[in-house]
């Protein structure tokens, strides 16, 4: 499986990160948007 991380995500308030997990056929298994506001 593959893990794709986009960090930092811009144009939002706070600090954001996107994590996408792909299976062996490059299909999305799980995706998360993490936002931490200060």
Curated annotation (Swiss-Prot):
Listed cofactors: FMN; Ni(2+)
Catalytic activity reported: H2 + NAD(+) = NADH + H(+)
Q: What is its EC number?
A: 1.12.1.2
Keywords (alphabetical) are: Cytoplasm, Metal-binding, NAD, Nickel, Oxidoreductase, Plasmid
Top class in the EC scheme:
oxidoreductase
Note the superkingdom of the native organism.
Bacteria
GO molecular function term, any single one: metal ion binding
- Keyword Aminoacyl-tRNA synthetase annotated: no
Q: Name one GO cellular component term.
A: cytoplasm
SUPFAM superfamilies, from UniProt?
HydB/Nqo4-like
Q: Subcellular localization, per the record?
A: Cytoplasm
Subunit structure, as described in the record:
Tetramer of an alpha and a gamma subunits (flavin-containing dimer), and a delta and a nickel-containing beta subunits (hydrogenase dimer).
- According to its UniProt record, which protein family does this protein belong to? Belongs to the [NiFe]/[NiFeSe] hydrogenase large subunit family.
**Protein name according to UniProt:** NAD-reducing hydrogenase HoxS subunit beta
Give the organism, scientific name. Rhodococcus opacus (Nocardia opaca)
């Amino acid at each position: 499986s593959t893990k794709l991380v986009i960090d930092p995500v811009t144009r939002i308030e706070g600090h954001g990160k996107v994590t996408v997990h792909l299976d062996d056929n490059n299909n999305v298994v799980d995706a998360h948007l993490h936002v931490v506001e200060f």
